[in-house]
Amino acid sequence: MSLADQALSYVRAISPYQPGKPITELAREMGIPVEKIVKLASNENPLGMSPKARKAVEAAISGIERYPDQFDLIAKVAERCGVSSNQIVLGNGSNDVLDLIARVFLAPGRSAVFAQHAFAVYPLATLSTGAELISTPAKNYGHDLNAMRAAIRPDTRIVWIANPNNPTGNFLPYPEVRAFLEVVPKDVVVVLDEAYNEYIPPAERVDTATWIKDFPNLVVCRTFSKIFGLAGLRVGYALASTEVADLMNRIRQPFNVNNLAIAAAVAALDDHLFVADSYELNRRGMEQIIAGLKRFGLEHIPSHGNFVTFRAGDAAVVNQKLLKQGVIVRPIGGYGLPEWLRVTIGTEPENARFLEALEKAL
């Protein structure tokens, strides 16, 4: 009998998360120089990190021997989101806070609801607690809130919602989300994952943090990995009622966000010009990519994120041909979409390189 046999059966049954292929890995496999590889697989900001955040990181290095103090970032998030500091939970990326929510509310004998084609971390977080995962059929490749409401059982403790959804980019109109909150049992936590919130057109965007006072069972999760360009530093946060935030903070590791991440995130929240430039680059890039997909006669899913998902036919073959040309995109067969690929919006030259490679791969 091995040590693995002593592990929890539901942990042994979990399939590990498969991230986008790193540039260095493709360079090793294909012998392609790193500088000739274009990675459009992980929804990272093609502009990199905010200049203000970079300066803050450089300044913070001098105090790296000290344990982190989350006060400044919590205060900045509270100011930005209009909540009190005791409603905020910081995480080592938003995946960390998603996992904290699962650990607080899920256990064997309980269940969580999520939508087909939704973010892979929801099943991981759920199944790692021994809880049952209830998957509901997608509607136009996104969430069907009516089906999700119908799937809630007496033992359900969490409903996972990504808005916009990853990997499909679908966006749920805010009135529909609020109407869903009105009918969900008050003892069921609704997790609203807004990793791509800043890519929603400003005229359409609603600050759902203001809803928490009306719906104490709502938890809003956001990240600095996308438009703020801090994916490698790993920092995100949850906004919740004081009661829920307190429970999450009880099991949170004491120093789960490092000094450099805290300094960068505080500065990034003040770099409004960088965020505006990133949004505009994404808007133009989305138009460029979609125009190319239409030119090739490829179906795509309308996206409110910094990526677009398109039907590639034999996606595995197309993906391999792209890799051989030094272009990395994201296969999403693991999300139940074996014929589709997801491409991150890059800079204008990166997008052009992708479209050129895709035309050759089709």
From Swiss-Prot:
CDD domains xref list: AAT_like (cd00609)
Catalyzed reaction equations: L-histidinol phosphate + 2-oxoglutarate = 3-(imidazol-4-yl)-2-oxopropyl phosphate + L-glutamate
InterPro entries per the UniProt record, alphabetical: Aminotransferase_I/II_large, HisP_aminotrans, HistidinolP_aminotransfase, PyrdxlP-dep_Trfase, PyrdxlP-dep_Trfase_major, PyrdxlP-dep_Trfase_small
GO biological process, one term: L-histidine biosynthetic process
Cofactor(s) the protein needs: pyridoxal 5'-phosphate
Biochemical pathway: Amino-acid biosynthesis; L-histidine biosynthesis; L-histidine from 5-phospho-alpha-D-ribose 1-diphosphate: step 7/9
Keyword Protein transport: no
Protein EC: 2.6.1.9
Cross-referenced Gene3D superfamilies: Aspartate Aminotransferase, domain 1 (3.90.1150.10), Type I PLP-dependent aspartate aminotransferase-like (Major domain) (3.40.640.10)
Keyword Nucleus: no
Family: Belongs to the class-II pyridoxal-phosphate-dependent aminotransferase family. Histidinol-phosphate aminotransferase subfamily.
Known partners and oligomeric status: Homodimer.
Name this protein carries in UniProt: Histidinol-phosphate aminotransferase 1
Lineage: Bacteria, Pseudomonadati, Pseudomonadota, Betaproteobacteria, Rhodocyclales
